[in-house]
Amino acid sequence: MPRKTPIERYRNIGISAHIDAGKTTTTERILFYTGVSHKIGEVHDGAATMDWMEQEQERGITITSAATTAFWKGMAGNYPEHRINIIDTPGHVDFTIEVERSMRVLDGACMVYDSVGGVQPQSETVWRQANKYKVPRIAFVNKMDRIGADFFRVQKQIGERLKGVAVPIQIPIGAEDHFQGVVDLVKMKAIVWDDESQGVKFTYEDIPANLAELAHEWREKMVEAAAEASEELLEKYLHDHESLTEDEIKAALRKRTIANEIVPMLCGSAFKNKGVQAMLDAVIDYLPSPADVPAILGHDLHDKEAERHPNDEDPFSSLAFKIMTDPFVGQLIFFRVYSGVVESGDTVLNATKDKKERLGRILQMHANERKEIKEVRAGDIAAAVGLKEATTGDTLCDPAHPIVLERMIFPEPVISQAVEPKTKADQEKMGLALNRLAQEDPSFRVQTDEESGQTIISGMGELHLEILVDRMKREFGVEATVGKPQVAYRETVRTPAKDVEGKFVKQSGGRGQYGHAVITLEPNPGKGYEFVDAIKGGVIPREYIPSVDKGIQETLKSGVLAGYPVVDVKVTLTFGSYHDVDSNENAFRMAGSMAFKEAMRRAKPVLLEPMMAVEVETPEDFMGNVMGDLSSRRGIVQGMEDIAGGGGKLVRAEVPLAEMFGYSTSLRSATQGRATYTMEFKQYAETPANVSEGVISAKVK
């Protein structure tokens, strides 16, 4: 079956924003204008097509990134048909894992900003993730009809806060209630949308006289940015500022956007049906197709570097980036195809796990409606049914040409809670439900506390766990009682402990046990656990050395202070002895474990606690209350700045997670509900002695 749309006409984009910048509304309008969705779904009444989980509709926030396909021929029907795959990404801090995961499979992103709030804390997190995966982006300043809207302020903030070079390719005509349309700086025409047709119809008009000077000033800046794309253009531009043609300007801006040097900037009001189609045109004009992105690198099964080019001729390779449980078809695995072609019914290799599986049906999604398709090709995003083994981050590829694309790295959870089923009947269902949810979301972990037998769930924040418990109830019908949130402490050591021995000997007639290991333990900040074999002269036979390492790794799960996991330690195995008859793997595993426990006691063990980067936006009158409250929570204030547009202050602080429980309630009462905050994990830091004493005694009781 030949390709319907050439790969050059594909755009895989994410729409990313801070909560309430209007991202879901923007996506809805895209679906409306591209003719997929006939009635515009409003988030205000909870009917948005992309937000397809019940809780999202209640909370009005987007949680799971749904992938949707739309087609676009340009606002004026002046392009050949392009295929735009949109991945909707959440804008809430507890869901950064979702954003990170979708960034990995995007070729370009559209950053949506609120014209009043501008660049907010979460926007910075998303921007950093886009930088990490080198995703080219355009910016859309939404809600230009709101009181206090200021397009140029947002342009400045992108430079100051995000260090991005924002190049407006439009400027707004009017703002707030008088927002009518935009001036297209490339065509130097005004675009005015018609309200009757919900913005489907529009007209090109002359630039209003009162904006002529401003439009020329910003066009000059835009053309200058375009001219820097090449020596030839720069010379042509310097010779005559007006000599660059519309096509030359677009091609040059495209080149610089794809190189991540500039961010073209547009504006509009999705809610008022203005500006969204021009943004779609910009997606086609400036964001890359899969063919514009360099070949993707990976490793074959022998760890040799391998690459795949974005075309149909290379062997099939793809990355699974999301798993969802669907009530009708069971598990859906969303995957992005980087190269080659695959048909439903084909056998694919899960190279990450080295297991072959048969690809059942392939579905293309529109929010949560689905269309079955026979095959997918390079550049496509689709969902597969019938893969049992795949989890997020796995590579699915052609069995004859194995490749492992890079692994996604997921953050460790920082908060945990005990959950107990309310009835005996819920007991079994709960285990099943939790495993399903953990499969979908790698930042969510489930384990059983060995001492108490309780089930412990861990995640990225209170809201994250709250939503998962809620999903358990709705999707799996499991009622559960949730314990108080607990902090995920860690243990480590501060000083080295040299030549500490562990000896496990049981010799009382018959076959005995004999294992003897001598280790040196030292701090290993930020590097995790490291094991070094420094045995000379065969004092411990080769085959027993991995057992010592295994014994130590088992002991790492529970430290000597309060039984928390041990991190950032380096262990060197220096000496030991063995017995010809009595030594075995188990004896050396025990010896390793004993040596490590003793070494840790001697190496000044300390407790580490998760520190959170907290940002509070507050009216100036409540500054004192907010700062005082943060200090009382052992917070270290790291900076303050004015919120642009006279909207109060932004306070940045680092606060231990242990002190942040119930913060939203106390912030509300301290500021009469007028302050907002965001918080995300920053790092682990040593817990002060007086605090760790309390934690240890509470745990040891």
Curated annotation (Swiss-Prot):
Domain annotation tr-type G: ranges: 8-291
Cell compartments where the protein resides: Cytoplasm
Top-rank lineage group of the source organism: Bacteria
Binding site for GTP: 17-24, 88-92, 142-145
Gene Ontology molecular function: GTP binding; GTPase activity; guanosine tetraphosphate binding; translation elongation factor activity
Biological process annotations from GO: ribosome disassembly
Matching PROSITE patterns: G_TR_1, G_TR_2
Keywords, comma-separated and alphabetical: Cytoplasm, Elongation factor, GTP-binding, Nucleotide-binding, Protein biosynthesis
Location (main, coarse): cytoplasm
Family as reported in the entry's similarity comment: Belongs to the TRAFAC class translation factor GTPase superfamily. Classic translation factor GTPase family. EF-G/EF-2 subfamily.
Summary of the function given for this chain in its UniProt record: Catalyzes the GTP-dependent ribosomal translocation step during translation elongation. During this step, the ribosome changes from the pre-translocational (PRE) to the post-translocational (POST) state as the newly formed A-site-bound peptidyl-tRNA and P-site-bound deacylated tRNA move to the P and E sites, respectively. Catalyzes the coordinated movement of the two tRNA molecules, the mRNA and conformational changes in the ribosome.
Name by which UniProt lists this protein: Elongation factor G 2
Organismal lineage: Bacteria, Pseudomonadati, Pseudomonadota, Betaproteobacteria, Burkholderiales
